[in-house]
Amino acid sequence: MAKAPKRAFVCNECGADYPRWQGQCSACHAWNTITEMRIAASPQVARNERLSGYAGNAGVSKVQKLSDISLEALPRFSTGFKEFDRVLGGGVVPGSAILIGGNPGAGKSTLLLQTLCKLAEGMKTLYVTGEESLQQVAMRAHRLGLPTANLNMLSETSIEQICQIADEEKPQLMVIDSIQVMHMADVQSSPGSVAQVRETAAYLTRFAKTRGVAIVMVGHVTKDGSLAGPKVLEHCIDCSVLLDGDADSRFRTLRSHKNRFGAVNELGVFAMTEQGLREVSNPSAIFLSRGDEITSGSSVMVVWEGTRPLLVEILALVDHSMMSNPRRVAVGLEQNRLAILLAVLHRHGGLQMADQDVFVNVVGGVKVTETSADLALLLAMVSSLRDRPLPQDLVVFGEVGLAGEIRPVPSGQERISEAAKHGFRRAIVPAANVPKKVPEGMQIFGVKKLSDALSVFDDL
């Protein structure tokens, strides 16, 4: 007699499970996201496959010395986009499982379709679509002017059927669009549920490891911009990248959040055109599109994204508030960091903005999370408050502590060299980041305290 399916209550946002229903998830604090699921007992064969691991079949595993394992590097192959290769750590590793997410309309399917059409000229590829019909994909490829003669297409949502066909076709690269619509027959829940996403992703990852085929899975995102589905989805894959971009901007940023074969937080920049996505080889140029007129409240900083320095402009507007509670708005920067810096500026800089509205924005839609932007943000706000522009050939970076000290940041020499390459001739940096060999024609101001930076600003 077959066993009755088990019941579980699982959060659709984070995947946490509970013995009974409750209104709010204790893990992610989301409301009304816990649903009941019936989990059927998995067949014995499937259980044995899960226990065998990713690297081999059950019964043939053996203990090996770490020194005896081959150190031969896996040969990567290029995607045809240098920016995409940069984010992946130098190209696609055979047998890797990659997850790419992004908002609807960001260009995930377009980027992967362009990539596979290029690679199909020299290797065997397979594009599996579960959301769009084959005719819709063909129409998009025709509109973008892509070569379609050698690209293999498949419209299927059953993971078992997809892997069976992949075993026959033996592609080197396979795209699954998207993981949220795929399903397994053994999992008794609807496609897109936590159990289905978890099991299908684990099945595809195991298939990639044992067959040596690279698999790229497209994932949806939640309303706050994070990848939808259980957190275990990001744990079982090798690389997780996010394609981001505002709806009113033609630029897209591709950022790695997890990468077992390269640097994390690596950034690639693309531009959406009528012919699809085109890579931007010099991102600093698009983020520094400053006009001829010098305005107050503008400063240029150097941020470090993955393995590359990037020049970004910060805009600040400080204006007298007509309300009892002045507004503090930060776009592209952390709101809490802005509040801390305003307090430091009042305490150690002698400038108070308690009666001022403060608006700050990072040009180009870039999101800056590192603290090296502190000093540039403070000087931009002081510039707007005094209505006195900073010189256009000035670049600023440095972390500001709670005691008003200017702390050094990593890769100071590389940041200064990047600024000099783009024509900047003056820089305000932490004293510990002043290089021993200053680039020719560049003047460096090393500061130890916030008051020193304000004094340099007064003398410019």
Feature locations, PLM:
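P-loop (Walker A) phosphate-binding loop of NTP-binding proteins
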Residues: 103, 130
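Peripheral, non-AAA+ core regions of ATP-driven protein-machinery
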Residues: 2-13, 17-86, 93-99, 106-117, ...
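Divalent metal-dependent catalytic cores for phosphoryl transfer on phosphate-bearing substrates
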Residues: 134
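Conserved RecA-like ASCE P-loop NTPase motor core of nucleic-acid helicases/translocases
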Residues: 125-129
